[in-house]
Amino acid sequence: MTHIEIRHAMDPVSARQLDTAGLREAFHMADLFHEGEIRLVYTHYDRMIVGGAVPAGAPLVLDEVKPTGTASILDRREMGVVNIGGPGTVSAAGETWEMGRGDVLYLPMGAGPVTFAGQGRFYILSAPAHTAHPARLVTLADAKKVKMGAPETANERTINQFIHPEVMPSCQLVVGYTQFHGGSVWNTMPAHVHDRRMEVYLYFDLAQHARVFHFMGEPSETRHLVMKNEEAVVSPPWSIHCGCGTGAYTFIWAMAGDNVDYRDVEPVAMEDLR
């Protein structure tokens, strides 16, 4: 069974007026991972689709997604799949890939229906595409690793880049995940914005009662959302996106937009945050 929700884009002036419930309705994504189901959120931020598939013993097939207006989801799109669960398989275009926890699979435009099987918990990301690049499974060992931060600022972390220009080609999808060193809890701090790309975060590896306080909004009008394990949040191009956890966590970041340059950002000075 496939469930699809649509999220319309919002401008920063309107977002300033929202209360907590309104912010969560507009930007927060809960309940993406349900056993025996595919759950998708079609956003109007660069037409990014975000979702989860949990086969739970029976294969799940992702094919037609009506909001895309095509017969099959990958007719004019590319896709990234991250396994945050147990061992599983993903099949498309006559090939099957074995995916362990933390593996990332890239599927190109034209790959046809996608089948998820096994014990995986598959996080799905899809953006419009203009050409077909080769499908590729990227393991953590294959990813490019960038170390940032320091223990003194509680933000020492390793940024693992998977679907990324320095690892493999894609049309506009950029995907990776960030792991923290012991005692560090701040992500993407100092903050930045990138007006040419949207971004979406999925927080996972959180303990049951742990939370991440995710900060968003214009630098001069910040707000926060409280995130649990396996919850996602969409970041508009005009918004900062950073967070602080009450304990250890990992987060997947994914972007789509005008370019795939990870360094194309506008830093925000601490004195400009409100």
From Swiss-Prot:
Keywords: Isomerase, Metal-binding, Zinc
Cofactor: how and how many bound: Binds 1 zinc ion per subunit.
One GO MF term: zinc ion binding
Superkingdom as given in the UniProt entry: Bacteria
InterPro entries to which the protein is assigned, alphabetical: KduI, KduI/IolB_isomerase, KduI_N, RmlC-like_jellyroll, RmlC_Cupin_sf
Pathway: Glycan metabolism; pectin degradation; 2-dehydro-3-deoxy-D-gluconate from pectin: step 4/5
Pfam family, one: KduI
Recorded catalytic activity of this chain's protein: 5-dehydro-4-deoxy-D-glucuronate = 3-deoxy-D-glycero-2,5-hexodiulosonate
Cofactor(s) this protein requires: Zn(2+)
GO biological process: one example: pectin catabolic process
Amino acids binding Zn(2+): H192, H194, E199, H241
EC numbers, comma separated: 5.3.1.17
Function statement: Catalyzes the isomerization of 5-dehydro-4-deoxy-D-glucuronate to 3-deoxy-D-glycero-2,5-hexodiulosonate.
Family per record: Belongs to the KduI family.
Protein name: 4-deoxy-L-threo-5-hexosulose-uronate ketol-isomerase
